Amino acid sequence: MDLTVEPNLHSLITSTTHKWIFVGGKGGVGKTTSSCSIAIQMALSQPNKQFLLISTDPAHNLSDAFGEKFGKDARKVTGMNNLSCMEIDPSAALKDMNDMAVSRANNNGSDGQGDDLGSLLQGGALADLTGSIPGIDEALSFMEVMKHIKRQEQGEGETFDTVIFDTAPTGHTLRFLQLPNTLSKLLEKFGEITNKLGPMLNSFMGAGNVDISGKLNELKANVETIRQQFTDPDLTTFVCVCISEFLSLYETERLIQELISYDMDVNSIIVNQLLFAENDQEHNCKRCQARWKMQKKYLDQIDELYEDFHVVKMPLCAGEIRGLNNLTKFSQFLNKEYNPITDGKVIYELEDKE
């Protein structure tokens, strides 16, 4: 019985159960190109389903990758009717929070105290304060996920069968994935406090008839739903992206161990920017040969360390992989592994930018 794991993502691309797919790794290894490629291939292979690609990276490269502007609201990729993109903007989300707080303070200003609070918050004071909190980007990204789940459950707006996350570099991503457990513990403590001090807190905060305990319980239930889904291998998986160099391999191993500690499924690695040995002299200089020799050394280590993973080896292309056309050409090698002999010409077809 052949137990060899396929060196491609065909099983993931054709999966009908996955709701959440995270794509992450060290900075500069091609995470955005990889996440765009996965999203495109899934959309092409399952035309009757809707897919959403979300950037949780503050750098926001989806617009650059596709060559069109995306924002905080999901918008279809031009040329595809079942793939949408959105870029979570923490600064815009903080401004919305600040405006909401100003409105709330002004509405509760009948006793004169709300006017003072409203004046204090005018000019973005809340946004300035919270914007400096470590991990706020990850928290806001997590809030967007929660809002998306709630809209899906209530049948509001467009529904998506699968959400692909183009994540921030490793440290940010790990903080993001820790949030369900962290929030669950935090809300447990808040629940104990509000059960004892709920009426006093309502009075102090001018919350009127707002049931703080009820709101916390609702939030806790939503967080628990996400935690359960993120740890279900049929619903969620993480695709690691790296290049064939020591530091990238080291960080990939650290990332995988962390993901395992979170009980999150991880069984795929995309190795980008591989030169591959070429037979023709025109494209096989001494520097290329030396670099391929170095890459091959770490590739052998990856194959040995992760023999039960889908290890996808992607070529370094002659030009930038930008625009839907180039991304589609490149992404085919996630579904069917790249062969330097038969597919080598494709990497030079991408030499001219769209």
Curated annotation (Swiss-Prot):
Gene Ontology cellular component annotations, sorted alphabetically: cytosol; endoplasmic reticulum; endoplasmic reticulum membrane; GET complex; Golgi apparatus
CDD domains in UniProt: ArsA (cd02035)
Primary subcellular site in the record, as a coarse category: cytoplasm
Annotated Pfam families: ArsA_ATPase (PF02374)
Active site: 57
EC number of the protein: 3.6.-.-
Binding-site residues, ATP: 26-33, 245, 272, 315-322
GO molecular function: ATP binding; ATP hydrolysis activity; guanyl-nucleotide exchange factor activity; identical protein binding; metal ion binding; protein folding chaperone; unfolded protein binding
Keyword ATP-binding: yes
Keywords: Arsenical resistance, ATP-binding, Cytoplasm, Endoplasmic reticulum, ER-Golgi transport, Golgi apparatus, Hydrolase, Metal-binding, Nucleotide-binding, Transport, Zinc
Domain of life of the native organism: Eukaryota
A biological process term (GO) from this entry: post-translational protein targeting to endoplasmic reticulum membrane
Positions of Zn(2+) binding: 285, 288
Subcellular compartments: Cytoplasm; Endoplasmic reticulum; Golgi apparatus
Top-level EC class: hydrolase
Protein's job: ATPase required for the post-translational delivery of tail-anchored (TA) proteins to the endoplasmic reticulum. Recognizes and selectively binds the transmembrane domain of TA proteins in the cytosol. This complex then targets to the endoplasmic reticulum by membrane-bound receptors GET1 and GET2, where the tail-anchored protein is released for insertion. This process is regulated by ATP binding and hydrolysis. ATP binding drives the homodimer towards the closed dimer state, facilitating recognition of newly synthesized TA membrane proteins. ATP hydrolysis is required for insertion.
UniProt cross-references to PANTHER family, sorted A to Z: ARSENICAL PUMP-DRIVING ATPASE ARSENITE-TRANSLOCATING ATPASE, ATPASE GET3
Further remark: Present with 17300 molecules/cell in log phase SD medium.
Subunit structure: Homodimer. Component of the Golgi to ER traffic (GET) complex, which is composed of GET1, GET2 and GET3. Within the complex, GET1 and GET2 form a heterotetramer which is stabilized by phosphatidylinositol binding and which binds to the GET3 homodimer. Interacts with the chloride channel protein GEF1.
Family under the similarity heading: Belongs to the arsA ATPase family.
Protein name (record): ATPase GET3
Record organism: Saccharomyces cerevisiae (strain ATCC 204508 / S288c)
